[in-house]
Amino acid sequence: MAPQQQPSSIPTPYEDLLREILETGTPKGDRTGTGTTSLFGRQIRYDLSAGFPLITTKSVHVKSVVGELLWFLRGDSNVRWLQENGIRIWNEWADENGDLGPVYGVQWRSWPTPNGQHIDQIAGALETLQTNPDSRRNIVSAWNVSELDNMALPPCHLLFQLYVANGKLSCQLYQRSADMFLGVPFNIASYSLLTHMFAQQAGLEVGEFIWTGGDCHIYDNHVEQVKLQLSRDARPYPQLKLNKAADMFSYDFSDIEFTGYDPHPVIKAKVAV
């Protein structure tokens, strides 16, 4: 059984979902051969105006979160830039030259069209926020079916939609495959940061970040780590200080600072490849 939830005024939707998976999930096999406990179709929400959702029940490597997002926004698909900045989270999937194929950043910035052109989805999304904020078509997708076989790993977090109401920007992410212990805290933080960037560039306030998961799973070799995490009380979320860059593609590490981040110690676990 999972540890009992400790009373707290701090919203903990991520930890609540971890607990639900442990208590009610279904044992399933998986591609990696590790084994999981899984639930299908869950959603968690964060009010971005109330604090930045950087998980506090364990320490999240902030530089990797920021660096990976900047790398996506560069349209890059080689791990060299990540490695030069001390980030190794993609090493296991790269080939001998550091290439990953046409993964996230390539699809975001350079989606190929049948006539040989390319679409910059990020630039298009920002333009839509600025010119037609009520659009229901403001979607960015990394799930390019024609190129999946050329990717080192098909996109797990594959599609996000932007929504404006009352001058506030919200973002909903759909994640088909959710490694709840290792991956999802990164994804929540990454797309929350991206939402702040879009809002800043479009002259909007931030609203909600909504995470929607398909196969939400805890790997069998992460169960003890999850139980340890759930035994900890959540601490207040940090605040984000974001210097405004010239455009969406000019943000740098120095523009992004989290203040008041005081997490519990890191909990190590092996990534399933």
Swiss-Prot record:
InterPro entries: Thymidate_synth/dCMP_Mease, Thymidate_synth/dCMP_Mease_dom, Thymidate_synth/dCMP_Mease_sf, Thymidylate_synthase, Thymidylate_synthase_AS. It is found in: Cytoplasm. Signal peptide: none annotated. DUMP binds at residues 31, 136-137, 176-179, 187, 217-219. GO terms for molecular function: thymidylate synthase activity. Keywords: Cytoplasm, Methyltransferase, Nucleotide biosynthesis, Transferase. This is Thymidylate synthase. It comes from Corynebacterium jeikeium (strain K411). The gene is thyA.
